[in-house]
């Protein structure tokens, strides 16, 4: 039954994909995955790169046919044929937790990844079944946030780690101006917050978030007592009703503000204009600290 649903899911993806019937243009740099590609493009020379979609959003018909005739109808085989054809000098990605990237082989080029977010023991990339270093998990260079996380990557992947910081944060200049916001709480809300009996990495959501709820209630009481204003920097993309309701259940109708996560939201400008940034485990918290801002971790 599981195989049936897996095949059905893949067929749905094939049905929704856009198809291209011409061979892609060969470039020196191949960007693996469209997510984060704009950030990588910003540090590359113009017209030096080609982007390889990896999420079935678009597929090259010629490579698919090649896979079909070789009896290897798998995304890994498709991606490998694509990479073999481009034969780039550099294969780079912003999606550092996709195992497919590490399994791809280059004829002559170098492989790079740029760490895109905070990694923890609960991250799928660091789950228990991946603790042993895979022989075929290899990159030439890992551009990581710091030396500590670099050492953790090297327990799993062969390659050299380089302290690089956050590309996204570093791409936005620090704005030193008058503070517009008082207490800015960086939300890490997920849909599971409203489904306490669901599990995350083997932990019930009710247990996963109980300490955060305890802290938020303390923050509510503290701000009421000291006449401080709280803003919530939203995490969820549309729809946001569940996230808004989660915080409303805690803060009620008190003096607080919810800032939606929209494509046009200037997130780094907002935290630069905040008096204190607070949070639990968001990458943005670490980025705020690296920007020289006042930060509280809990």
Identify the meaning behind each predicted range.
Residues 111, 142, 230-232, 295:
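Hydrophobic/aromatic residues located in beta-strands of well-ordered beta-sheets
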Residues 93, 116, 153-154, 161, ...:
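A donor-sugar binding/catalytic signature common to diverse glycosyltransferases
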Residues 244-262:
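Nucleotide-activated donor-binding/catalytic signature segment of Leloir-type glycosyltransferases, i.e.
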Residues 62-71, 127-129, 174-185, 268-279:
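Short, surface-exposed amphipathic charged segments that create phosphate/polyanion-binding patches used
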Residues 3-171, 284-285:
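Active-site and donor-binding regions of nucleotide-sugar-utilizing enzymes
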Residues 40-46, 167-249:
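Conserved catalytic-core segment of nucleotide-activated headgroup transferases in glycan assembly
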